[in-house]
């Protein structure tokens, strides 16, 4: 950890991501020497009235917001917290992904975003495959929240079969969020998921999610 604080801004996809930043990521990042700010991506800027926030509908809108944020010289590093599943198909790198592992594909897209924005302060991060991936990593913790259910066993089986939480696939019926909804109708994305992830903690997430661990390692190298 460094003694001088630098500002890290995290542009997040929605409310659930913001909650996880507040409760899990921010305390860790502050300890690493960052002053953390965050914002939810703007989806609509009307001529009058408040802007709408949450969700990523197109690369053009996201690119404009990233560049708007980078106008601030106060930001040392700008990073993102968006799902790889459902990321806009018009985004750089999405249409020429390599036919290899999910790790290679997401890294290809992130590198393409970096190249397009062309600002050394920009460190894009896409969650493999979505925020609920981290809830899969916290399967045992979710099991404690839903004691008496077989939720933990179902999630752990999926993780074992896939080879890790980040490899639970991203099909429209089999993505982590779809599986959670099917396994547990009362599961709350904005409450239960963040609680379980916080209980698992940063080190638990890093141990199970290599792409997440690589992202934090890159941020740590910049403090």
What residue spans do the PLM features occupy?
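Catalytic nucleophile-elbow at a beta strand-turn-alpha helix junction centered on a G-D-S/GDSL motif
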Residues: 10-19
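C-terminal accessory helical subdomains adjacent to catalytic cores in phosphodiester-
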Residues: 1-5, 18-49, 63-223
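Non-catalytic terminal and connector segments of soluble metabolic enzymes
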Residues: 52-59
